[in-house]
């Protein structure tokens, strides 16, 4: 099994990066080949847009079967799931080696769906600035 873990550093003692699309490194661990480790720098870390999709494509190209990360957006989530890759959430502040150990012991939660609420994070003003401002931001004539 090939496992991908988002990481803030290039080794197993680094912390799991909570951001999938903007993580600094992907650490791939191949359990079948005596824990062979491959570290790949995330090219999408400084992308203006589309970082999540580009990161997902990197993981797919590396033939990962499982991803362990902190948080993941809807676009990379859909891309990974449609490729048959399972996604697990690591708790904040955990080291890569500990997340890997927790995965093997079935202590991590699989992310099977994302909550996509109304407005997709834009709030009540739907991105136009007409939120809970009691009329502020909108001219009244």
At which residue positions do the language-model features occur?
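Cofactor-binding loop segments of dinucleotide-utilizing enzymes, especially the Rossmann-like FAD-
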Residues: 8, 31, 70
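Short coil/turn linkers that define WD40 beta-propeller blade boundaries
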Residues: 34-35
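Extreme N-terminal starter segment of soluble prokaryotic enzymes
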Residues: 1-3
